[in-house]
Amino acid sequence: MEEKKFPMGGCLPEEKDIRDYKLKAGVVSEAALPEEFVFGVNVPVKNQGAVNSCVAHAMSSILETHLGDVESDDKTLSTNFIYGTQKLLHGHTGEGMYLRDACATALKYGDMVYDDCPGNIEVPDCYESAEAALNVPSKTEKAYNYRINRYFSCNSPAEIKYAIYNYGPVLAALNWSYSFYVDDEGILRTDDEKPEYCGGHAIMVIGWTKDGFLCQNSWGEDWGLNGKFILPYTMSFTEARGIEDYDNRLDEEDDPIKEPLLVATLKIVYMIINKILNFFKGRGQTK
């Protein structure tokens, strides 16, 4: 059992949302995936300390993997920006964060480099510094370079594998128990027949082996297997989000991501409204 009690409950449970994108039916069943796979870009293991910012840590790590292996001073991204702006951007107050909110922030704003919004601060103290950074145009313009294109729900282990293989690391959550430990092979274990769960925890899923999913945690390199662990297939994630970067988009004809019905319907409505407006605008110009 882990001696050090890291914060739990930092990943808040979400309800289903009809606006969520998901993978099209049949895409995963037709995909030929290897028995084992690990995403090829390594990023440093972060340490959230006693702050309930696991979602922001996992999200910023995923964005860092999108930068590739290129050496850059701007390669360390902020966790405080994602965690500290959620009150202003999404209306959530209190410790912890939703996966969807972190994805929505990365979709609209990207993420700031660490020096533009430094620190790892718990709410409510993180709000002031993060919101102040958001009001600096030069910082938000730079953050926009790290924006994602889309995110989508992964509703099965097969969909998580497909997302990692085609798009890169997945943002995921699981219920955590303090009875969990990592064995010598790096596999997450518990000796309790019915473990007592103490809250949700977010991690970055970077691949899979024959034993389970390879995950990168945010509790420092001294935890687990150099900061990582394998979640066995007998355990499961509570939710997961695939992340599409601008550099890993597929052609529109081969696009495996399904647009939610609500979004597709609204597009049709907007198209009809625009046609009507343009019709009357054209009639006015011919008079």
Language-model-detected regions and their locations in the chain:
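Predominantly the structural core of cysteine protease catalytic domains
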Residues: 2-9, 32, 50, 56, ...
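N-terminal zymogen propeptides
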Residues: 1-37
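Asp/Glu-centered strand-loop micro-motifs enriched in Gly/Pro and often flanked by an aromatic residue
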Residues: 36-50
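Phosphate-handling active-site elements
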Residues: 64-81
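Acidic/histidine-rich, surface-exposed loop or edge segments in extracytoplasmic proteins
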Residues: 85
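Positively charged, low-complexity intrinsically disordered regions
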Residues: 20, 25, 148, 190, ...
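Short, low-complexity, charged amphipathic interaction modules
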Residues: 259-287
